[in-house]
């Protein structure tokens, strides 16, 4: 029997299967028969042994009837110029992984991590792309790591393999990671079909969590590990809009495979995240995570946080120094009575008052007032390192190597904030003394006191 006659024989058995031709040619290739098209197979007069026909019949049955993935049946899969061994119980490499790696920008990248590496597809493809990279691959599955080691040998690359669950790998990696590439478990249990039933569930569904969980953790990781310059991940089309929205505070873009289908995202973390001042929900979430926001106030560039210790670390400032509490008008009722009495005469405005050793101010800007009404009271200080002056433009912080490594984000306002780059006047109500002021501020301050006949 010729190969083509055998093809026709099996075609009749599986004629309802649209992918039969491709599957048949792939199996033939596994046994050393190289035919790119059925036409070339037809022109061939090569014979096939009965022993081999029995093997191929069994493989076709397992694939089309029992829905066992072809790479498991053949024991290998070819992705362009890369060869990977496969094994039941270990996630099968996909061609889309190469599209992810094709999107990598290697500028300033020295170290890379394939998170949830499985059989090592992304790590190996990345090392092949740039041999000078220091590449790590981590996975919780020891069987997957053993297979990854074999695949690295097959493809003649050296990778650092780590057995670790998810972010635990960072405890074992002693060098900062510049790039993370990952194809994390992102499916719902309801999305598992018969073919996927043969693949390990932990590679498909993330720790019995929802399909969004892994990406939310990756989002948080970029915010807290500022050394990570780039994140590239695979996800499903159903998650596209939600993830584009989640990562919109970073410079990010979608990734498409070689068939122009959406398969994932590329996120640049080399600049500080940017959040619109009207996006109060996100700003509040980031502040709750322990980050600080850089915002243009009515006086200077300000740094706001829910935590005084966060501000201390960023500003490299001596501990136990107090910061100004800044808030919206809705918070006035919670202030000491003395402050409430004079509030309407000076606030909103560039006046800071100290009462009971605590400092308070309400800014004179509608955007800031709306923000603070939504997120509540924050600690505020000038956005500068101790003994240095703050910048006058938000963009300056994005070009400063110190600031882009800090746990900060930019709060962007479309309206023009009237900032004069002069700190607010500070008056201590307890000691009745001006603590900080300029000649111009002092004149205006006393003018208001006289006008309203205030006894402060």
UniProtKB/Swiss-Prot annotation:
InterPro entries per UniProt: DHBP_synth_RibB-like_a/b_dom (IPR017945), DNA_methylase_N6_adenine_CS (IPR002052), N5-glutamine_MTase (IPR050320), SAM-dependent_MTases_sf (IPR029063), Small_mtfrase_dom (IPR007848), Sua5-like_dom (IPR006070)
Molecular function (Gene Ontology), one example: double-stranded RNA binding
Stretches assigned to the YrdC-like domain: 277-440
Tree of life domain: Bacteria
GO terms under biological process: methylation; translational termination
Pfam families assigned to the protein according to its UniProt record, in alphabetical order: MTS (PF05175), Sua5_yciO_yrdC (PF01300)
Protein name (record): Uncharacterized protein MG259
Organism for this UniProt entry: Mycoplasma genitalium (strain ATCC 33530 / DSM 19775 / NCTC 10195 / G37) (Mycoplasmoides genitalium)
Source taxonomy: Bacteria, Bacillati, Mycoplasmatota, Mycoplasmoidales, Mycoplasmoidaceae
């Amino acid at each position: 029997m010729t190969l083509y006659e055998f093809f026709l024989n099996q075609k009749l058995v599986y004629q309802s299967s649209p992918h039969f031709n491709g599957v048949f040619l792939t199996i033939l290739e596994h046994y050393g028969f190289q035919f790119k098209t059925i036409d070339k197979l037809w022109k061939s007069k090569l014979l096939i042994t009965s022993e081999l026909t029995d093997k191929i019949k069994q493989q076709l049955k397992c694939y089309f009837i029992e829905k066992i993935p072809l790479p498991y049946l053949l024991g290998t899969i070819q992705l362009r110029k890369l060869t990977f061994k496969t094994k039941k119980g270990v996630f099968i490499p996909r061609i889309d992984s190469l599209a992810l790696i094709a999107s990598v920008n290697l500028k300033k990248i020295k170290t890379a991590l394939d998170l949830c590496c499985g059989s090592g597809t992304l790590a190996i493809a990345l090392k092949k792309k740039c041999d000078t990279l220091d590449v790590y691959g981590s996975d919780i599955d020891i069987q997957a790591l053993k297979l990854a080691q074999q695949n690295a040998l097959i493809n003649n690359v050296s990778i650092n393999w780590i057995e670790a669950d998810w972010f635990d790998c960072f405890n074992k990696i002693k060098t900062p990671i510049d790039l993370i590439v990952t194809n994390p478990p992102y499916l719902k249990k309801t999305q598992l079909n018969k073919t996927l039933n043969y693949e390990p569930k932990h590679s498909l569904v993330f720790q019995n969590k929802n399909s969004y969980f892994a990406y939310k953790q990756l989002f948080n990781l970029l915010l807290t590990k500022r050394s990570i310059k780039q994140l590239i991940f695979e996800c499903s089309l159903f998650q596209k809009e939600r993830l584009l929205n989640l990562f919109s505070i970073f410079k990010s873009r979608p990734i498409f495979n070689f068939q122009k289908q959406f398969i994932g995202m590329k996120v640049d973390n080399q600049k500080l995240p940017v959040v619109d001042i009207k996006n109060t929900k996100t700003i509040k979430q980031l502040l709750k995570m322990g980050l600080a926001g850089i915002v243009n106030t009515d006086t200077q560039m300000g740094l706001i946080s829910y935590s005084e210790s966060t501000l201390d670390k960023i500003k490299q400032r001596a501990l136990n120094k107090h910061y100004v509490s800044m808030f919206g008008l809705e918070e006035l009722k919670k202030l000491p009575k003395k402050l409430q009495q004079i509030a309407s005469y000076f606030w909103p405005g560039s006046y800071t008052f100290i009462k009971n050793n605590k400092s308070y101010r309400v800014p004179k800007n509608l955007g800031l007032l709306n923000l603070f009404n939504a997120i509540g009271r924050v600690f505020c200080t000038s956005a500068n390192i101790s003994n240095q002056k703050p910048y006058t433009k938000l963009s300056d912080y994005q070009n400063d190597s110190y600031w882009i490594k800090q746990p900060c984000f930019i709060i962007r306002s479309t309206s023009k904030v009237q900032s004069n780059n002069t700190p607010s006047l500070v008056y201590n109500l307890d000691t009745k003394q001006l603590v900080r002021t300029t000649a111009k501020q002092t004149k205006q301050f006393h003018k208001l006191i006289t006008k309203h006949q205030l006894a402060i």
